[in-house]
Amino acid sequence: MSKPKIGINGFGRIGRLVLRAAVEKDTVEVVAVNDPFINIDYMVYMFKYDSTHGRFKGHVSAEGGKLIVTNGKTTHQIAVHNSKDPAEIPWGVEGAEYVVESTGVFTHTEKASAHLKGGAKKVIISAPSADAPMFVMGVNNDKYDKANNHIISNASCTTNCLAPLAKVIHDKFGIIEGLMTTVHATTATQKTVDGPSGKLWRDGRGAGQNIIPASTGAAKAVGKVIPDLNGKLTGMASRVPTPDVSVVDLTCRLQKGASMDEIKAAVKEAAAGPMKGILEYTEDQVVSSDFVGDPHSSIFDALACISLNPNFVKLIAWYDNEYGYSNRVVDLISYNASK
């Protein structure tokens, strides 16, 4: 089967890392990129140099108005567009069947569907969506309906970390209820120094100077991808001054009591079996920087987990909120194309 051809709208953190993941995995072909604020020479520079993930290990250049990206194994010849209106991007002309909507702007079905006017067949929103169906690889991707799901969401990076872990625990032991905290790395929406921030005043405080309590819909979103957990999970975030890698703390009550060894065994089995490549298991004494560039959605930290009793436990899982998530965007497209 030929590789699915994709376009990327928005060449920011996720857009660029989706391209890196696509080149690395070699399961899709990127044929077009659109960003109204970045010209092709700047795209070359931004893709080549990355303060968090290091220099791109392949070769990138601008030739004949196209972005040429190769890593020695495969070459992507990418048409570049600079349109603000998604309906005006000629995805069909470029051969892009799947569009990754990674601007963070067009997250509703109505707005994201503008890509279909340009000839795209499917749109994958790389953010949570209020009205598009959300799919998390390893959790509910088997519910994808190719005939009817044209605009879908890959959920959030935090939901992609939490949901696989919650599924394993719920399937094996039953989750009665739970609270999640994500200790989350800085993202582009934060301020470098104190500045105005609408109603959520704390969000406007300097990212490099503070631990900032923040809201997140990631835990509630698990209820959308695992209906049995709807209304049973909620959570919050603490934004911290690190550039990448976040960690989920899931504290939950279990229906069926379990020792920590039994919980670890269940996660380890899933990581080696049905969730291989999505969920990972470690017993090493790791810290956040050890996971920069990790392609998994969720890395269970066996040594960091604790229990008060067999029915009340705190479970810890790491995730590269940039690169791990970008890998799942590519995987979701590959999966959908195979249906």
UniProtKB/Swiss-Prot annotation:
Family in the record: Belongs to the glyceraldehyde-3-phosphate dehydrogenase family.
CDD domains in alphabetical order: GAPDH_I_C, GAPDH_I_N
Stored NCBIfam families: GAPDH-I
Subunit structure comment from the entry: Homotetramer.
Chain residues that bind NAD(+): R13, I14, D35, K84, N321
SMART domains per the UniProt record, alphabetical: Gp_dh_N
Positions annotated to bind D-glyceraldehyde 3-phosphate: S156, C157, T158, T187, T216, G217, R239
GO cellular component terms listed in the entry, alphabetical order: cytosol
Active-site residues, record numbering mapped to chain: C157
Subcellular compartments: Cytoplasm
Keywords per UniProt: Cytoplasm, Glycolysis, NAD, Oxidoreductase
Pathway(s) of this molecule: Carbohydrate degradation; glycolysis; pyruvate from D-glyceraldehyde 3-phosphate: step 1/5
One MF term in the entry's GO annotations: glyceraldehyde-3-phosphate dehydrogenase (NAD+) (phosphorylating) activity
Any one biological process term the GO annotation gives: glucose metabolic process
Protein name as catalogued: Glyceraldehyde-3-phosphate dehydrogenase
Site feature location: Activates thiol group during catalysis: H184
Catalytic activity reported: D-glyceraldehyde 3-phosphate + phosphate + NAD(+) = (2R)-3-phospho-glyceroyl phosphate + NADH + H(+)
Pfam families: Gp_dh_C, Gp_dh_N
EC numbers on record: 1.2.1.12
Organism: Onchocerca volvulus
